[in-house]
Amino acid sequence: MSQYLSGNYYCLTDKGKVRKINEDYANALINPFGNVLLMVADGMGGAQKGEVASKNLVKYITSEFLSLEKEFKNEKAMSKWVYKVVKEANSKIYLKANSDEKFKGMGTTLSLVLLVKDKLLTAQIGDSRVYLLIDNNLTQITEDQTYVNYLIKSKGMPKEIANTHPKRHELTNALGTKSRVNLDINIRDYHNERILICSDGLYNNVPESDLASIIRGNDSLDKKANQLIAFGNFNGGSDNMALILWESEN
């Protein structure tokens, strides 16, 4: 199934203008088989707990990805591997949080993309997001696992009200906070769309129309990434921000 994917990526995180610690973590890499892995994790728990959770999660999956000894044969193999490594990472973080008082309550979101040939897998926990640029429109392809999104989906709450709801940042799912992981995995055909993965600190401070305008542009990826972070800080920088940009050359 595997075929070497050619493209460029850029990762960037920033603590913003309010938080003292950056609890967001991101990584992007290509393994020897030409598979692409992109991850953004937004830690939570405060007092450096979230920083440990997000960093440990991304580093563990990175290590497992680089240790792969064979190619993914099909979509089932992709899903099985992602579920396995995320489950293992969850167990490690949960154990650490429950065996060491200083890490009690830590957890993290995860938005992961695995590209294998013409297939794009997303794995989602929490409220970080994956966007694709489809027909010049920025389209969110993951679903926020938040209380307000639950209200929108099940109770018909208007998005305008949800945007100012006092519980709009409350997660309904996080990694490391429970012994069992609840992972949302989806696979779709990949047609070389541009990809943006980001934490809520970015999309809450930069309107989607502006995200799209920058992603559409022809600047280098590092310039786009820095523009996005600068935009977020200009609009208040109320939270840590993490992002990954990917542009295919296939």
Regions found by a protein language model. Give the residues of each.
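PP2C/PPM-type serine/threonine phosphatase catalytic domain
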Residues: 1-250
